[in-house]
Amino acid sequence: VSSQVGCKMNCKFCMTGKQGYTANLTASQIINQIHSLPERDKLTNVVMMGMGEPLDNLDEVLKALELLTANYGYAWSPKRITLSTVGLRKGLQRFIEENDCHLAISLHSPLTAQRSELMPAERAYSITEMVELLKNYDFSKQRRLSFEYIVFKGLNDSQVYAKELLKLLRGLDCRVNLIRFHAIPGVDLEGADTVSYTHLRAHET
């Protein structure tokens, strides 16, 4: 589900960022992406991981989440919904405190300098600050915290990165989702091979 038309974050690996930002979606426009599906009654989960940065349009996103989870709306369990974000600090804290949906952080590198190259938002909202903020909340029960990690060939796919990930996330009740990269035009990034995935998984468990 998308939260914006376009996106301001300009992550190197994302095609949406190359298109620039046009507008925020309203709560009704966000909900309509679900309601207009012929299969909507068969949906089991919704992920806010489409176009846009949800925390950059948080007022409307929270309204949409309320409609999805409230008894007067769709009455879905918050456990059926995951919000994915680069981690805008102010919005992140508000999101955590105002609803109970699952949270997924786009990580992609445990190293600040490298993450800044992949995700310019790191320069304003560092991953280390986010981790320290997240440690103030309990993710050991119903609510799930995960970190998304696209594995790039020769960039973040070595055992060194697995160790840095463990160091960064130590003390958090979370999971790391390893994601395959699908190439986009004009970007000098390549997806890692299966061996790299296996090595990373072995060090994370």
PLM features per residue range, with description:
Residues V1-S28:
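Canonical Radical SAM [4Fe-4S] cluster-binding loop centered on the CxxxCxxC motif
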Residues V1-S3, I34-D41:
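N-terminal [4Fe-4S]-dependent radical SAM core
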Residues Q29, Q33, K63-A64:
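Alpha-helical scaffold elements adjacent to nucleotide-binding pockets in ATP/GTP-utilizing enzyme cores
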Residues P38-N45, G50-V195:
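Conserved AdoMet/S-adenosylmethionine-binding subsite of the radical SAM
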Residues T198-T205:
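Conserved small/polar residues in nucleotide/adenosyl-binding loops
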